[in-house]
A protein has these predicted regions:
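Structured catalytic-domain cores with a bias toward divalent-metal coordination
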Residues: 2-6, 14, 19, 23-25, ...
Length: 245
């Protein structure tokens, strides 16, 4: 959209009003004016808080304005080949210079556990489960997460994953539940069928039995999952919301 423009010119173009966009004043319906005022607030914020980063030069603290920030959110245009290089450079800089140890992802609890398991083990089966969510971006995602796995090993395993989204694929979420389960512990008889389905990777059956077990056998589920039970509860809540939606 803003080809051949500098970052400053692109921001200015984004904040153009109907009067300034083409040099002529245009009548604007009232509903459009209301929406325009909302957009002006967004554009003003972006204009006041945007710092262009040029990838021909190394990143430095000044690129981020305030070195005390603890959360960094980056946008991207999906499908662009430079995205992966940007993500690598950004995370490596933030980890080494700003102490960032957590990679945020747009996934729910279960799907995030699949990624976390890959990051801990390097087992490609876990990565492949996650890639089912990525569609046409699967190749770029695979490249990034394989890089992050190797980088995390070099950093002593100090990097973790946290999900901020919803459960998009219930089968993948069930694999996340499998990652939370302790395969060495024998479950109570009341939830044995659920655990067996999970271990057999019969995920559609496990999904139905999981919902029943959480409703009817919460104590047995808490005993089986132990310290991970809070995450299991959040996964169950996420699935309920998704089903309702």
């Amino acid at each position: 959209l803003y080809t051949d423009m500098t970052a400053e010119e692109a921001i200015a173009a984004g904040t153009a009003t109907p009067e300034t966009a083409d040099g002529e004043e245009t009548a604007v319906p009232e509903t459009v004016e209301v929406q325009s005022k909302k957009n002006d607030t967004v554009h003003t914020y972006l204009k006041d808080n945007t710092t262009p980063i040029y990838w021909d030069y190394p990143l430095e603290d000044a690129d981020f304005g305030n070195a005390d920030y603890r959360v960094f959110l980056a946008g991207e245009t999906r499908g662009q080949p430079q995205n992966t290089a940007m993500r690598k450079a950004l995370f490596q800089y933030l980890h080494e210079q700003q102490g960032v140890n957590v990679q945020l992802v747009e996934t729910g609890v279960g799907e995030t556990q699949v990624l976390e398991q890959y990051l801990r083990t390097g087992d490609e089966n876990w990565l492949n489960h996650y890639l089912k969510l990525q569609g046409s971006c699967a190749d770029a995602e695979a490249e990034y997460w394989r890089w992050l796995y190797q980088y995390n090993r070099q950093q002593g395993g100090t990097i973790y994953v946290a999900g901020l989204g919803t459960e998009r694929n219930t089968v993948v979420s069930m694999y996340g539940l499998l990652a939370l389960a302790d395969t060495e512990i024998e479950p109570a008889e009341s939830i044995a069928d659920f655990v067996q389905a999970l271990r057999d990777e019969d995920m559609m059956t496990a999904l139905q039995l999981f919902k029943t077990a959480m409703e009817e056998q919460p104590d047995a589920m808490a005993d089986y999952f132990g310290d991970a039970y809070a995450q299991v509860q959040q996964l169950y809540a996420n699935l309920q919301v998704n089903t309702t939606y």
